[in-house]
C-alpha cells in the first residue's frame, strides 16, 4: 500500500477540505480519467482496492497512472481506552482529494473497457466521481 517513506512530523490535525482543486484537474498522461466530484479523504487501502479493480478489468493491457498519494497520517486510539492522555498513534494514511482532481488515468485501452474499469473503481471509493476523456477520444 502507498505511504510516505518519511515525514517531517508524525501526526497532523484533521483539518477540512475547502474549495476546488488548483492543480491536477486535466488529463496529463492517459486518454481517459476518473475525476472527483466532491471533497473526501481517500485512504491508501481504498486507492489500492480501486487500482486492483481497474487492472483486473483491463486484463493487464494498457497503462494506469495513480494521480493521488496518501500523505496525511490519521491517528487512532486503541479500543476501550479512556479519553485524554494524548493523541493516538498514526493508524493509516489518507489523501485529501478536492473536487475536480483527476485521481486515475488510463491509456492503451478502448473507451468501453476504460469506462467499465472506472465504474468498478468508483464503487471502491468513498466519493462521487465522473469519467473524463481527451477531446477526440470519445
Curated annotation (Swiss-Prot):
> Which keywords, in A-to-Z order, does the entry hold?
Ribonucleoprotein, Ribosomal protein, RNA-binding, rRNA-binding, tRNA-binding
Q: How does it assemble?
A: Part of the 50S ribosomal subunit.
The protein's name: Large ribosomal subunit protein uL16
Give the InterPro entries listed for this entry. Ribosomal_uL16, Ribosomal_uL16_bact-type, Ribosomal_uL16_CS, Ribosomal_uL16_dom, Ribosomal_uL16_sf
Q: Does the keyword RNA-binding apply?
A: yes
GO BP, one annotated term:
translation
Q: Which family does it belong to?
A: Belongs to the universal ribosomal protein uL16 family.
Sorted alphabetically, which NCBIfam families does this protein's record hold? rplP_bact (TIGR01164)
What this chain does, per the record? Binds 23S rRNA and is also seen to make contacts with the A and possibly P site tRNAs.
Q: Which GO terms describe its cellular component?
A: cytosolic large ribosomal subunit
Which terms does the record give in the GO molecular function aspect? rRNA binding; structural constituent of ribosome; tRNA binding
Q: Which organism is it from?
A: Rhodospirillum rubrum (strain ATCC 11170 / ATH 1.1.1 / DSM 467 / LMG 4362 / NCIMB 8255 / S1)
Amino acid at each position: 500500500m502507498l505511504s510516505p517513506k518519511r515525514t517531517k512530523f508524525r501526526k497532523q490535525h484533521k483539518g477540512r477540505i475547502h474549495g476546488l482543486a488548483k492543480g491536477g484537474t486535466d488529463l496529463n498522461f492517459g486518454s481517459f480519467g476518473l475525476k472527483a466530484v466532491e471533497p473526501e479523504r481517500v485512504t491508501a487501502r481504498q486507492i489500492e482496492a480501486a487500482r486492483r479493480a481497474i487492472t483486473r478489468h483491463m486484463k493487464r493491457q494498457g497503462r494506469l497512472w495513480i494521480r493521488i498519494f496518501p500523505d496525511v497520517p490519521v491517528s487512532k486510539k486503541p479500543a476501550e481506552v479512556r479519553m485524554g492522555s494524548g493523541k493516538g498513534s498514526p493508524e493509516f494514511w489518507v489523501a485529501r482529494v478536492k473536487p475536480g482532481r483527476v485521481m486515475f488515468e488510463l491509456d492503451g485501452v478502448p473507451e468501453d473497457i476504460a469506462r467499465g474499469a472506472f465504474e468498478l473503481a468508483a464503487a471502491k471509493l468513498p466519493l462521487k466521481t465522473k469519467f473524463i476523456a481527451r477531446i477526440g477520444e470519445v
